[in-house]
């Protein structure tokens, strides 16, 4: 089965065409500057990238260009669009309504729209992409895969906030978690790689990218995760603050004469390691500044690693033990000095880091020593493949 995977943002769109049987990526690319001037990047497997500058007033024109590229006689991945069997859409927030991938009927889309206020930056864009695909491919099944779905197994003690219960009843204010597709994929891949029985395992997944989160996966199900109602809670991230004393919002608002939107902009876009360091949200830049002795870059890296280690420790307690810790995503897969810093706090678990294997980038590898009491590994994530494979079981 050929599955077109779509990840739609407000002015951009990423796509991959994947064969679910072979798990081969047939073609991939992105559309940028939708609504401005438009740019399509297309790459068939084994060929060079093709870049086309063309107007994309809306997502519909962008997706039409993707479809045209996919069955282009010269470099297309399919001879005819009828060879695309299904479209898998990433949807950021499914609230409490969706615990698994679902076919996108009108009834389902209405429920997704109800979740827009929980993810105002993401869900509306996801819906625009879905509608555009429906218009252009009316006979192809559309499936929604939700970032929040994997975390719906969290118990009430993990997802309820210490707020008046009426806010949960009226507005569904609770912890939802994100990166669920990645956490699900990596926990399964980790168990398979280490030959663990997923249904009898305790795995902690550290998805460390510009957005970052940790999850506790007990017997294949998520029992806790670091993000909350929104992706702002939890770890210190690229530009997001993560956990803070809520009273800071009032304090900063008064000092800086900001309204609530202004404060939220600071917490979401001007904080994290970029705000701490004054250098960058990119750990390649941070590592260079760290090695040059930049004190603020050193602070940023130390704070980031310390927060991750604290969450890992918390989830060891939540599961009463741990069999494996898996690092994934951009930083988790590629930044060895951050992994080393995080693991340095975990000696009490009997973890010993193998500094040689810890130098790996972007490949499956055990980075703990053979006599380490807990196995630590790097497991590359593949959210597009995970979305593709989730369609098979519907």
Please provide the spans of the model-predicted regions.
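Glycine-rich phosphate-binding loops at beta-strand->alpha-helix junctions
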Residues: 323-346
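Conserved small/polar residues in nucleotide/adenosyl-binding loops
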Residues: 392-394
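Phosphate/pyrophosphate-binding loops at sites that engage ATP/ADP/AMP, CoA/4′-phosphopantetheine
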Residues: 69-84, 190-197, 312-323
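Short glycine-rich, Thr/Ser-proximal phosphate-binding strand/loop in the N-terminal lobe
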Residues: 3, 12-56, 228
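Glycine-rich beta-strand-to-loop/alpha-helix junction loops that act as flexible
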Residues: 9, 89-92, 208, 326-334
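Glycine-rich phosphate-binding loop of actin/hexokinase-like ATP-binding domains
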Residues: 150-253
């Amino acid at each position: 089965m050929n599955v077109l995977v779509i990840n739609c943002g407000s002015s951009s769109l990423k796509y991959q065409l994947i064969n679910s049987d072979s798990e081969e990526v047939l073609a991939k690319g992105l559309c940028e500057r939708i609504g401005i001037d438009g740019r399509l990047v297309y790459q068939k497997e084994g060929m060079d990238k093709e870049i086309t500058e063309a107007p994309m007033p809306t997502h519909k024109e962008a997706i039409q260009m993707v479809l045209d590229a996919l069955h282009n006689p010269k470099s297309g991945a399919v001879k005819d669009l009828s060879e695309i069997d299904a479209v898998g859409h990433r949807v950021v927030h499914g609230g409490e309504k969706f615990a698994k991938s679902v076919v996108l009927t009108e009834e389902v889309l209405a429920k997704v729209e109800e979740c827009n206020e929980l993810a105002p930056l993401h869900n509306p864009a996801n819906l625009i992409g879905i509608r555009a695909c429906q218009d252009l491919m009316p006979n192809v099944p559309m499936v929604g895969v939700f970032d929040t779905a994997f975390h719906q197994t969290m118990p009430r003690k993990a997802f309820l906030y210490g707020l008046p219960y009426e806010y949960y009843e009226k507005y569904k204010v609770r912890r939802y978690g994100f990166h669920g597709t990645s956490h699900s994929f990596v926990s399964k891949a980790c168990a398979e790689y280490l030959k663990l029985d997923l249904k009898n395992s305790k795995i902690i997944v550290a998805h460390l990218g510009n957005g970052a989160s940790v999850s506790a996966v007990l017997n294949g199900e998520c029992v806790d995760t670091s993000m909350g109602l929104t992706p702002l809670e939890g770890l210190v991230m690229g530009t997001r603050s993560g956990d803070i004393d809520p009273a800071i919002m009032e304090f900063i608002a008064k000092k800086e004469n900001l309204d609530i939107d202004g404060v939220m902009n600071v917490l979401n876009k001007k904080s994290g390691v970029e705000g701490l360091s004054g250098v960058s949200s990119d750990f390649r830049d941070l590592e260079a500044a760290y090695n040059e002795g930049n004190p603020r870059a050193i602070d940023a890296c130390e704070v980031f690693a310390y927060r991750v280690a604290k969450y890992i420790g918390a989830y060891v307690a939540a599961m009463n033990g741990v069999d494996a810790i898996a690092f994934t995503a951009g930083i988790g897969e590629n930044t060895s000095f951050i992994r080393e810093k995080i693991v340095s706090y975990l000696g009490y678990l009997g973890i010993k880091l193998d500094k040689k294997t810890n130098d790996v980038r972007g490949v499956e590898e055990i980075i703990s020593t053979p006599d380490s009491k807990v196995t630590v590994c790097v497991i590359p994530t593949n959210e597009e493949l995970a979305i593709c494979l989730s369609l098979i079981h519907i």
